[in-house]
Amino acid sequence: MEARERGSMSSSIGNSAELEGNLTLSDRLKVFKGSTFDPDAYVTSKCQRMNEKETRHLSSYLVELKKASAEEMRKSVYANYAAFIRTSKEISALEGQLLSMRNLLSAQAALVHGLADGVHISSLCADDADDLRDEDLYDMDNKQLSNIENWVVEFFDRLEVLLAEKRVEESMAALEEGRRVAVEAHEKRTLSPTTLLSLNNAIKEKRQELADQLAEAISQPSTRGGELRSAVLSLKKLGDGSRAHTLLLRSYERRLQANIQSLRASNTSYGVAFAAALSQLVFSTIAQAASDSQAVVGEDPAYTSELVTWAVKQAESFALLLKRHTLASSAAAGSLRVTAECVQLCASHCSSLESRGLALSPVLLKHFRPGVEQALTGNLKRIEQSSAALAASDDWSLSYTPTGSRASSTTPTAPHLKLSISAQRFNSMVQEFLEDAGPLDEALQLDGIALDGVLQVFNSYVDLLINALPGSAENEENPVHRIVKVAETESQQTALLVNALLLADELIPRSASRILPQGTSQSTPRRGSSDRQNRPEQREWKKKLQRSVDRLRDSFCRQHALELIFTEEGEVRLSSEIYILMDETTEEPEWFPSPIFQELFAKLTRIAMIVSDMFVGRERFATILLMRLTETVILWISDDQSFWEEMETGDKPLGPLGLQQFYLDMEFVMIFASQGRYLSRNLHQVIKNIIARAVEAVSATGLDPYSTLPEEEWFAEVAQIAIKMLMGKGNFGGHGERDVTSPSVSSAKSYTSN
């Protein structure tokens, strides 16, 4: 019971890849969004009966889900960022208008209260006015007014001088002093409302004058470094932080544009060096702007949003410039290495900004991806064309891969592997392609485009190998589809299989390991490597490579089977007449396997010797090849309707002698396939079914087939003698107890003598 529950749990966890394929990200995240979600209970329910492997699997699934969620959130933020910034600016503008309105209302309220207090004081003092002498009152008021007026006059004179001399710090201190005096005058009512309002307006005008002066200084190209930061900070202290931040970013933008113009003027070519210098210039400028922004305005969300918008704009301009001058030309020429180096440099510089909260990779991805895909397509097309040209002159002889090329130095071929000329070149081109495409796939998140392209060109190369087989259906239907040198001999034809197998089974996966999902490397521990090798994406990609090899193997088997079954003129050699006509003779036949099955045995023996030399360390593939070739011939007999119609319902049905010969032929196939260790269960069952059908055909004529057929040991003994004869290890005189001669003995003697 416990084992069944554990298996159920493992199955549910193991289907995470299936869930990813059937559910959207939002659906998979619903379980975590509920108000009743309990993390501890969720983890406990998943891990209660899980072993170590299942726990690692769940952990890996949750990590991938976390990454997918973060990426989805990032895409959503960037997709709606412009609207968010636009709304944020509108809200900020509205807040500013509300603040101005509040200040205006406060000033008006102060004026009204001041007027009301003045009227009230006048009414209270009306009765005592006669007690004061007019000249004394005038002297007292004049003394107070003269003191304040003198201070105001001196204040504005001093402020004018400070502004004219552009002494920013002292000007700001003076403005602060004036503000403080105005506040005290308002609180102590030492100034009339009209005078106080005039003083405030004058201070506001001077403050605006200083702000304009600072803005002009910030806009000057010569203002840089500490002077720039100081001016921006001063403008922010004056209450115009939004303007200060905008001017700071504009200053960096003007400086960046000027530096880009100088860089373009000093470069005669727009290659990797230009891309590296341009990338360094742009992203270092963005980094410096971000640093100054944080130093001046801090982490205020409003300013951070403006910085992000500005950085995205600069990154887009940079991407378009690099795309127009470098990537477009290299992509059109199919120069994947130049494209890869440029993109890798840009991605490296871009990633350095992520620590500052600026993730600009999606911007580069949007603009670089079309050009990169064009470069990938151009390289893949070049690989196809070069492979086809080499296949036209390949003699299909195997040799060790030469060393010294860029591909062989980075991904060395195992010394025991031999390939033909076209396969060697195909392998080196694929290695170079994947070496260049690896950084692109990682930087631009190409979702396996490079691997799909490799699979495509490998399928095309396998098509070339299929066309190299004699009598290939592709060549017959479309002779000009591919001009390929035909593999005439069995060794050459087997070499075609070696090319495909070694490429699909070892060389291409080794080259692709750097960009396969969590690809393995030689430095990783064995256990981790094994876990990654079992990833569904990697296994599925390798299965697709193997299916192409299977296509070639099936074509190989079909071609050799057709050589046995049909003559060059297209006539059928393996027909029912071989067995039906045996009962028309009056003499006892000399029992021996039919010539066509002798040829099948000889062909399989030759191919077995060839594959034993060529498929060293890959005996399983060699066994499957021999198994499939034998099955192809036997299945043709099983499925040929005309063969069975003549045997079962023809004018001359199958007789006992023909049945015995047919039985012997099938037993012969089973024995030599069993001895060669390529007798599959399927082949064994098909042969048994064929024999049973032939026996039923004889029974349908009213004869008892078992009364004429020898014992099974007889068939096995004759088949064994035939095998020895055909291999040159026996002779007919060595078995005198039975007459095992047949009409086919002469062909056997001819075969062994040759």
Curated annotation (Swiss-Prot):
Q: Where is the composition biased (Basic and acidic residues)?
A: 528-540
Q: Name one GO biological process term.
A: exocytosis
An annotated GO cellular component of this protein is:
exocyst
Polar residues bias spans: 518-527, 741-754
Keyword hit for Glycosyltransferase: no
- According to the record, the residues making up region (Disordered) are 514-540, 734-754
Which UniProt key words apply to this protein? Exocytosis, Transport
Supply the SUPFAM superfamilies for this chain: Cullin repeat-like
Pfam families in UniProt: Exo84_C, VPS51_Exo84_N
Its function? Component of the exocyst complex involved in the docking of exocytic vesicles with fusion sites on the plasma membrane during regulated or polarized secretion. Involved in polarized cell growth and organ morphogenesis. During cytokinesis, involved in cell plate initiation, cell plate maturation and formation of new primary cell wall.
Q: Which family does it belong to?
A: Belongs to the EXO84 family.
**Which PANTHER family does its entry note?**
EXOCYST COMPLEX COMPONENT 8, EXOCYST COMPLEX COMPONENT EXO84A
* Quaternary structure, from the entry: The exocyst complex is composed of SEC3, SEC5, SEC6, SEC8, SEC10, EXO70A1 and EXO84.
Q: By what name is this protein known? A: Exocyst complex component EXO84A
Biological source species: Arabidopsis thaliana
Where is the organism placed in the taxonomic lineage, from the top? Eukaryota, Viridiplantae, Streptophyta, Embryophyta, Tracheophyta
